[in-house]
Regions:
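Clamp-loader machinery-focused feature within the broader ASCE/P-loop NTPase space
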Residues: 1-136
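Conserved catalytic/switch belt of AAA+ P-loop NTPases
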Residues: 113-116, 139-155
Length: 155
């Protein structure tokens, strides 16, 4: 995975703005990542998540990548990290019948209304290929973005 230092060198304005937002406790509850770079699409949401939950920020404002929360994010074992990606044959994200319907928007959203079990209390959600959401899923997620549950980060 590409680290914070590499992103700081490649995208200094972006990382400086995010680090400042974290230091001043003004990080947004949602970030939209648009890129054709597959590594950026994979790595950057993890770095954002680590920045949000990090217990020991670096002097430059980035995540330490060594505390318990950062290690859990990097190792893919952070208990409140959820990914939604298109899985149907049509390659679209659908709303689903109810919260018990896995890999649907209703299931994904239901994960953020449960109590957090992580030390930081933050819940992280990543929607991969958000442009594949069908119209009903888009409308449902828009409501969540307008009125987000507490201590949630969506990428």
């Amino acid at each position: 995975m590409t680290g914070w230092q590499t992103y700081s060198e490649r995208y200094p304005m972006l990382t400086a703005a995010l680090a400042h937002a974290k230091r001043s406790d003004r990080m947004s509850h949602a970030y939209l990542v648009i890129t054709s770079n597959p590594d950026f699409r994979t790595d950057f949401p993890l770095l954002l998540a680590a920045l949000r939950v990090c217990e020991n920020q670096r002097p430059d404002g980035g995540p330490c990548m060594e505390c318990g929360e950062c290690r859990q994010i990097l190792n893919g074992i952070y208990p409140d990290f959820h990914i939604l990606a298109p899985t149907s044959r049509a390659r679209e994200i659908v709303i689903g019948k109810d919260s018990g319907d896995p890999d649907t928007l209703r299931w994904f959203e239901s994960q953020f209304h449960l109590s957090s079990v992580s030390v930081s209390g933050w819940k992280i959600g990543v929607i991969q290929e958000a442009d594949t959401m069908n119209e009903s899923a888009q409308n449902a997620f828009l409501k969540t973005l307008e009125e987000p549950p507490g201590k949630c980060l969506f990428v």
